[in-house]
Amino acid sequence: MLARKSIIPEEYVLARIAAENLRKPRIRDRLPKARFIAKSGACNLAHKNIREQGRFLQDIFTTLVDLKWRHTLVIFTMSFLCSWLLFAIMWWLVAFAHGDIYAYMEKSGMEKSGLESTVCVTNVRSFTSAFLFSIEVQVTIGFGGRMMTEECPLAITVLILQNIVGLIINAVMLGCIFMKTAQAHRRAETLIFSRHAVIAVRNGKLCFMFRVGDLRKSMIISASVRIQVVKKTTTPEGEVVPIHQLDIPVDNPIESNNIFLVAPLIICHVIDKRSPLYDISATDLANQDLEVIVILEGVVETTGITTQARTSYIAEEIQWGHRFVSIVTEEEGVYSVDYSKFGNTVKVAAPRCSARELDEKPSILIQTLQKSELSHQNSLRKRNSMRRNNSMRRNNSIRRNNSSLMVPKVQFMTPEGNQNTSES
């Protein structure tokens, strides 16, 4: 059988195969850099190979609070069920040892009414009734159908023990639920940070800036901001320090170093000789393996609990030569905040060199500002010339349209032979 000929020419197939072989190898996308603090404020750290797990049980209350909600609710339910079942078994054993169960089984009708003074617990005939009595004792429901008598001192001991255990379980579990609902990090959900940080010139100095705001009307009392740079460093002895933390001072004119977070604020750090960013230029920033961690702490006005909000900025999230736009305006005697522009930035003139080079050569800043002013003036000239050209073109088009709309004059003869001119 003859083979079917291909519809595609063989020359085209060979050329296509050769072209695919000559293609450059595909470069994999660069993996995202690991960060210690996520944008949401969670710590991106995994604990492995912990041998002494029993240390968590030494502080059982904190362990219960730190658990997830589904685990906490399961433990909450199981603690009550297990205590009810445990004491139900004890009540059934007390009734069984005293012979109350056999007494209820042997006698019936009017004879059972005489047993109320001789049994330990009235109306406990089976394990089900013992379980119901255990719930009534611990939760203090008090239906009245089952009650204790003075016949069994052991039953009195079990009653006291169950009350003590029930109070302990209520205190621990209800306190755990309350602490989980009133945790301080819940308040931090309404404390927001700008997605990007910027580096620009302010008051003649290069500054690292970011914006922070509070969405609630209730204030954060004694709010303070701390900034740290975390990066990998190598000592002169060759030791590699994977987590090297360096504090960054915050430029705050208030001596107490607290901020009044009534409206979104731009937190500024002046890049000077004390700053870890002093030797970093715009070109070096893209290759830097650093992370700027921001910590906002304060006291919640309504609850008095100390709260903390965190975020971080890696090198890719720091915009050089940008500035935050203004979002606070005054409208009819009231200050208004437009949160839709919370993280918006605009490009501004900023030298691309490091702060060290800027201190050594202050003329760089003057030249940058002059170039920016010239480019701004040129853009204004171009804009004005474009406006003039557009207006001239518009006027010319209007004139042409008016000339085309002029009404022509028509001449016609009257019966007397005179010519009259009229416009149609």
Swiss-Prot record:
Residues 375-424 are annotated as: Disordered. SUPFAM superfamilies: E set domains, Voltage-gated potassium channels. Keywords: Disease variant, Ion channel, Ion transport, Membrane, Phosphoprotein, Potassium, Potassium transport, Transmembrane, Transmembrane helix, Transport, Voltage-gated channel. GO terms for biological process: adaptive immune response; apoptotic process; atrioventricular node cell differentiation; calcium ion transmembrane transport; CAMKK-AMPK signaling cascade; coronary vasculature development; defense response to virus; determination of adult lifespan. Residues 1-69, 177-424 are cytoplasmic. It catalyses: K(+)(in) = K(+)(out). Coiled coil: none annotated. Residues 387-404 have a biased composition (Low complexity). Inward rectifier potassium channels are characterized by a greater tendency to allow potassium to flow into the cell rather than out of it. Their voltage dependence is regulated by the concentration of extracellular potassium; as external potassium is raised, the voltage range of the channel opening shifts to more positive voltages. The inward rectification is mainly due to the blockage of outward current by internal magnesium. This channel is activated by internal ATP and can be blocked by external barium. Can form a sulfonylurea-sensitive but ATP-insensitive potassium channel with ABCC9. This is ATP-sensitive inward rectifier potassium channel 8. It comes from Homo sapiens.
